[in-house]
């Protein structure tokens, strides 16, 4: 709480800034304002530097008009998140630093990939095996740290939604699950980021829901009432989640159809990895699969498409990920986007219902 602590030096009444709910609101507004105010300048700079999106010529013909649209706008999202968290979160909380390490680490991987593609004009970007290698290094490192530093068995137990008191201990399997959740979610959001605003809105919705999970899990009264494990460190993740919401909404201002900027891998890989680590920390990995159902379906469509083509020589979809399939069926891009948003809203509500339905 850099800003809150600084303000209290001048006026004791500024202790009000130590309240979690107020800091959550301020975190949202700070990230939102950073994104909205810096966005136009960043877009102009990206245009000046000719950092534009390249478009596949075998995809929907309507996408050819997107060629040259500024990309790597994810830098704006990440900057807004990091600044907001540093200002309003309790920096003595190790969960905050674990989450920021994933934000920055996966952001760097995405940045290198984008830089190679759009600046050095290398269509392959960061070679896939190296991308997965560094994603794995970060994910396994974080998983091992969490396993070694656990202070409560509940921190590494599997919380099963809809069932009361079902929390099997995972042991070292916690490390394996954490790895797959972080890396899998990172790549799932990356695959979803193919239409204007398609990935950022589900990300904002899931982050907003996780803010509620983090708050209830980190509050001894709410956790007891809802019969979920009490993990006090998760309360500060509310600030991280609300920063994602604010930064995401600010970015959506420029990314909504027709997009003025794309987030690029620097944004999608980092946001996906961040949702993954937050799910792990609040012990809601299974609920992430529910709330992030759009990400799951997009990923499964790619896996099924590739598997079917290799095994049978036939494609299941006209094009994968599945949002392109609907475009090639004749759906206008805005229809695809909004319907996927609606599905995300429904799935997030189902996920939130697991808090009470046990």
Curated annotation (Swiss-Prot):
Name of protein: Phospho-N-acetylmuramoyl-pentapeptide-transferase
Transmembrane segments: 19-39, 71-91, 95-115, 126-146, 166-186, 194-214, 237-257, 261-281, 286-306, 336-356
Single annotated GO MF: phospho-N-acetylmuramoyl-pentapeptide-transferase activity
NCBIfam families (alphabetical): mraY
Swiss-Prot/TrEMBL GO biological process terms: cell division; cell wall organization; peptidoglycan biosynthetic process; regulation of cell shape
Membrane topology recorded in Swiss-Prot or TrEMBL: Multi-pass membrane protein
Pathway connected to this protein: Cell wall biogenesis; peptidoglycan biosynthesis
Known EC number: 2.7.8.13
Keyword Transmembrane: yes
Enzyme category, top tier: transferase
Keywords per UniProt: Cell cycle, Cell division, Cell inner membrane, Cell membrane, Cell shape, Cell wall biogenesis/degradation, Magnesium, Membrane, Metal-binding, Peptidoglycan synthesis, Transferase, Transmembrane, Transmembrane helix
Cofactor dependence: Mg(2+)
Superkingdom to which the source organism belongs: Bacteria
Reaction catalysis annotation: UDP-N-acetyl-alpha-D-muramoyl-L-alanyl-gamma-D-glutamyl-meso-2,6-diaminopimeloyl-D-alanyl-D-alanine + di-trans,octa-cis-undecaprenyl phosphate = di-trans,octa-cis-undecaprenyl diphospho-N-acetyl-alpha-D-muramoyl-L-alanyl-D-glutamyl-meso-2,6-diaminopimeloyl-D-alanyl-D-alanine + UMP
Function according to Swiss-Prot or TrEMBL: Catalyzes the initial step of the lipid cycle reactions in the biosynthesis of the cell wall peptidoglycan: transfers peptidoglycan precursor phospho-MurNAc-pentapeptide from UDP-MurNAc-pentapeptide onto the lipid carrier undecaprenyl phosphate, yielding undecaprenyl-pyrophosphoryl-MurNAc-pentapeptide, known as lipid I.
Entry's family note: Belongs to the glycosyltransferase 4 family. MraY subfamily.
Compartments, record wording: Cell inner membrane
UniProt GO cellular component terms: plasma membrane
Signal peptide as annotated in the record: none
